[in-house]
């Protein structure tokens, strides 16, 4: 009996599922491929609907050229495409797709329905499960194609187990669609998520209006227009003013030949053009469309085509640096006319609701659940407390809070205390900060005052940051910060604790949203909120150290290190330390 060959030919379904592992990572990859197919089909109206961040349902509807039933069958075969005829066509691509892998790959890991009608001929409906066509029939439809994806990864449970949360996919989905809004003008876009309209952009909206929608009015009010060079090498777009910057590169949108790309090279060139205009570790915000000869660009680096190799990188770098440098050297006034900006409803919406919100009664002080620490001890920095009288630079206090530890003296920012183990040096700044952080994270039963603003503070954020803030409203509320969403990108701060100023509060929330909007671990984000709030409060605040807080340190185990690694306590073993 002949033995079975070691080398086996894979069946078509397995081949497509393997290809899907490279092309289709998640629901965002599916939508990306489907909307690119719609654009390549000449559509100027594209509608997207998702449920569960796309993990439950994806529907992409377009008014492109459509397909006959025969074309649909061919399109489901691997490496069947209408976009190239031979390999050399790859180096002069004008379409977004060309491999002919995406549709069969998606079909192999989902339950798919394709409803399509060409310009000449009748419409058809094709149902595919796991890559196999199970039904095909004539079905009326207007010109165009509708593709519905249900049960993504239903037959690849391992892949399904690695999917992120629906909330994370929703945030990434929005960025994907925003990039398409910016990259291609003359196309109308609609997105319905969780059965609610997220946006509807009319196709006649110009580039400046689209940038205003995606980046917000705050960006556009001081944006600097870039329009340098002529085809085939040119750059156009908008730069944020040097005063408009972020802690990460999340506010940067780069397009090369209308393809959204993530280019560290281009970001670095533009950051260097800003040079000393930005504070350290801050990044400029911009939307730039760079056009280069097709033969200079290789988008075939990765199946998702978000990376690009540039043939004449040095020339392109110099061109960008000079173009951006010239714009930044101009008198810094916004080069965008107010008339060119898409009239966003956000601020008007905020004004309409201001009257009904301005009469909010002051909130009761916020209570946090109990730990066994004497309630008479004030929480560090929640309350200024009483200044401790000093004589010759040393604190004089009637110590009686704890029998475990005894206050000795104060040496500037260091307090010396003694217990059965010996003499301890307490670094007061780190101790105060750590106790404050514990008060937030451990939910101790202490009250601190929360103030309600007569006129709520207004925050404008990006849509992705808006999704992040709206999903963590309860985490802010636990800290006495009341956030109300007034629109996709507008939030009102109704109340906040008295231990943080208004400008510090706004800056902290904006920083947090920009830094953390892509994070999905709710517990980690909740801790990050408290940690960054602690750092913000202590960065600006210098208040006297209450000696009674020593008792708290001992009751929590007299820690040596604070939550951020700074030293709180050190055992004094010799006189050299005191001299330091």
From Swiss-Prot:
Gene3D superfamilies: 3.30.230.10, Histidine kinase-like ATPase, C-terminal domain, MutL, C-terminal domain, dimerisation subdomain, MutL, C-terminal domain, regulatory subdomain. GO terms for cellular component: mismatch repair complex. PROSITE patterns: DNA_MISMATCH_REPAIR_1. InterPro entries: DNA_mismatch_repair_CS, DNA_mismatch_repair_MutL, DNA_mismatch_S5_2-like, HATPase_C_sf, MutL/Mlh/PMS, MutL/Mlh/Pms-like, MutL_C, MutL_C_dimsub. GO terms for molecular function: ATP binding; ATP hydrolysis activity; ATP-dependent DNA damage sensor activity; mismatched DNA binding. It holds the Pfam family MutL_C. Keywords: DNA damage, DNA repair. One of its GO terms (biological process) is mismatch repair. This protein is involved in the repair of mismatches in DNA. It is required for dam-dependent methyl-directed DNA mismatch repair. May act as a 'molecular matchmaker', a protein that promotes the formation of a stable complex between two or more DNA-binding proteins in an ATP-dependent manner without itself being part of a final effector complex. PANTHER family: DNA MISMATCH REPAIR PROTEIN MLH, PMS, MUTL, DNA MISMATCH REPAIR PROTEIN MLH1. Belongs to the DNA mismatch repair MutL/HexB family. This is DNA mismatch repair protein MutL.
